[in-house]
């Protein structure tokens, strides 16, 4: 019944989607929550409501309740900072405030006493946030604007974030073309950019004698919704002044054609931007950083060889074959995550759950999260489980390929996790505690590819005169060429409840692992043959995007990508023109893969299951098989000192 007294019939599914809470509460009040249309959905919806309310309450009180960090009392206001310094007999907090104000003062333009804020400008609050650095317990103060009071800008609001696969490609190219890699961190990055919003504020006590005066915010102050986009635009204008061009495949990668002075060979220099972290790849990278420093001040201690990037330790390594290559090691991030997890279990959850002392593998043998029927977690434990999955997914992104399939499996239960799922996540943390050392090396060495394993055929009769689409606006290819290989696999009906299969994909540029995927397939396949088709089609689509990105980065790419699969029937069906379509349900995958082969974009061959490195991304593996396959991907993981 509507407010005007009229009535109408509405689909229950529509009401569940548009007004879930009201519908669930009505079912409870009317006593029909036991009906088939409600019996599972109502308690799930109400539990979700309670969880959201609980999380909001915790977030509102978390900052106020936290009084200490690393055993040091942290103030909430400038007045409290003064009191703490007087009580402790030092000026540590006031020094931190003074340091912040020296940098941020230029972001404010005082409004004369006889004037008011310009018409159209919105008043917002500003406040000081305090923190303590873990490395040296140094006090830190940051003045932030109350951007939550303003409307979201119509244009983009995000900062520069270069993709992870672009970082891996760039590091491999640096070693391949013998280029330097240097890093820099922009000092107070957002403050260097002009403010895009019309806002003003009343200055607080941190401004000293100017406290109480009105001021227009003229710089992209931290906290403003447009601050990230403002800095991004400011940085982009400077990159263009340096004659760098934004890559169309990844706008936060900037490239420029350069000539090496020692042998006059031409190549592309790259600048990668991740918010305020800059990675420069050039034959004289420090000179580029010095020029950037003239416009965007860089932290002096950050300029030079890279140390930590994206949460992982980045360093150059000499391989057994004598080649120098860059590698990412997330060991420090892993150790800190395990330590934080142990602290939370002890202090917040009262020791109810524990990290196992020994865990040789990410999952216990014979454990399956799909069939776990333990009790659902309460809201606090559910939130902790979701936090753990987020942390471990980032570990996978920065190189822990060995836990990819287990984390992917648990990620399917974020909305309704059970006690067994949390215990499985803690088992992964126990495994990481034991196997914390690992390195992902971006080896530029060319792989040994026997092209006789990839026979060519005439596909004209079946697909006509097709050819790979080459971007018309790609830059001139410079530098050394790369080879691309992909290994695909699937675990047919691996999910015990939905019977969906799991895809595993590994993509290499030369010997450098660039992309990896462990993901449930969207369809339910009735055969191993069909699941392998879906996996390879997914891989072909990713390969096409990677080939486009490489070309838009100016990387020479003349040959096809070499694809390996371990299902001989499916490989033959894809690579031999006369092979026929066996099921109509496979027609899209069948033609998509075969057309890729016909246009010369890919070539496909068979590989034994024992040699398929993508196998550990489709299902949990154990013992010698796991050591052999993952040992070919990650360095240090199974070394004796681990």
Regions found by a protein language model. Give the residues of each.
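RNase H-like nuclease module associated with reverse transcription
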Residues: 412-416, 483, 522-642
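C-terminal reverse transcriptase regions that engage the nucleic-acid substrate
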Residues: 168-171, 221, 304-451, 608, ...
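Mobile genetic element proteins and their domesticated derivatives, centered on retroelements
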Residues: 11, 78, 97, 104, ...
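Catalytic-core region of right-hand nucleic acid polymerases
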Residues: 20-21, 28, 108, 116-118, ...
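A short, polar/acidic, helix/strand-boundary loop motif
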Residues: 151, 507-534
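Long, charged, low-complexity intrinsically disordered regions
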Residues: 1-76, 92, 96-99, 106
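Catalytic palm subdomain of template-directed nucleic-acid polymerases
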Residues: 190-203, 222-227, 256-259, 263-299, ...
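Conserved beta-strand/loop block within the catalytic cores
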Residues: 90-168, 246-274, 450-451
């Amino acid at each position: 019944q509507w407010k005007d007294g009229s009535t109408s019939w509405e689909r229950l599914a529509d009401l569940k989607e548009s007004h879930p809470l009201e519908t669930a509460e009505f079912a409870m009040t009317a006593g029909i929550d036991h009906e088939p249309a409600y019996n599972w959905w109502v308690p799930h919806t109400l539990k979700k409501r309670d969880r959201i309310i609980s999380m909001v309450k915790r977030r509102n009180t978390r900052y106020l309740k936290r009084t200490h960090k690393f055993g040091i009392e942290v103030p909430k206001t400038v007045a409290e900072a003064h009191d703490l310094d007087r009580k402790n007999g030092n000026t540590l907090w006031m020094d931190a405030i003074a340091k912040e104000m020296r940098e941020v003062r230029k972001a404010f333009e005082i409004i004369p006493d006889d004037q008011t804020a310009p018409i159209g400008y919105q008043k917002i609050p500003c406040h000081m946030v305090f923190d303590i650095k873990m490395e040296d317990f140094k006090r830190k103060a940051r003045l932030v604007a109350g951007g939550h009071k303003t409307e979201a800008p119509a244009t983009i609001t995000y900062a520069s974030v270069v993709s992870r696969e672009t970082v891996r490609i760039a590091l491999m190219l640096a070693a391949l073309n013998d280029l330097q890699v240097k890093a820099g961190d922009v000092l107070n990055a957002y403050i260097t950019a002009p403010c895009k919003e019309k806002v003003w504020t009343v200055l607080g006590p941190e401004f000293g004698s100017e406290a109480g005066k009105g001021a227009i915010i003229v710089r992209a102050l931290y906290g403003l919704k447009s601050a990230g986009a403002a800095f991004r635009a400011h940085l982009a204008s400077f990159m263009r002044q340096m004659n760098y061009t934004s890559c169309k495949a990844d706008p936060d990668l900037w490239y420029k054609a350069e000539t090496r002075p020692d042998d006059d060979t031409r190549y592309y220099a790259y600048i990668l931007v991740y918010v305020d972290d800059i990675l420069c790849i050039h034959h004289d990278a420090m000179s580029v950083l010095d020029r950037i420093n003239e416009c965007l001040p860089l932290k002096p201690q950050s300029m030079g060889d890279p140390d930590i990037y994206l949460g992982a330790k980045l360093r150059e390594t000499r391989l057994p074959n004598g080649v120098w290559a860059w590698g990412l090691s997330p060991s420090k991030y892993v150790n800190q995550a395990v330590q934080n997890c142990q602290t939370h279990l002890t202090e917040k959850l009262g020791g109810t759950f524990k990290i196992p002392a020994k865990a040789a593998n990410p999952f216990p043998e014979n454990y399956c999260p799909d069939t776990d029927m333990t009790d659902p977690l309460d809201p606090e434990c559910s939130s902790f489980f979701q936090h753990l999955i987020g942390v471990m997914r980032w570990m996978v992104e920065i190189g822990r390929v060995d836990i990819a399939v287990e984390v992917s499996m648990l990620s399917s239960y974020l909305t309704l996790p059970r006690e067994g799922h949390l215990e499985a996540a803690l088992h992964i943390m126990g495994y990481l505690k034991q196997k914390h050392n690992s390195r992902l090396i971006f080896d530029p060495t060319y792989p040994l590819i026997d092209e006789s394993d990839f026979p060519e055929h005439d596909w004209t009769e079946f697909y006509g005169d097709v050819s790979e689409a080459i971007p018309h606006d790609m830059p001139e290819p410079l530098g050394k060429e790369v080879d691309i290989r992909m290994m695909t696999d699937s675990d047919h009906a691996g999910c015990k409840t939905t019977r969906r299969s799991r895809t595993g994909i590994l993509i290499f540029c030369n010997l450098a692992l660039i992309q990896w995927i462990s993901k449930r397939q969207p369809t339910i396949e009735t055969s191993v043959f069909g699941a392998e088709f879906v996996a390879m089609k997914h891989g072909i689509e990713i390969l096409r995007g990677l080939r486009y990105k490489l070309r838009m980065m100016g990387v020479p790419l003349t040959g096809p990508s070499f694809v390996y699969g371990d299902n001989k029937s499916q490989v033959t069906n894809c690579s031999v023109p006369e092979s026929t379509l066996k099921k109509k349900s496979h027609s899209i995958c069948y033609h998509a893969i075969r057309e890729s082969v016909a246009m010369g974009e890919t070539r496909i061959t068979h590989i034994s299951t024992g040699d398929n490195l993508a196998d550990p991304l489709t299902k949990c593996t154990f013992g010698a098989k796991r050591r052999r396959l993952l040992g070919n991907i990650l360095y240090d993981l199974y070394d004796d000192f681990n």
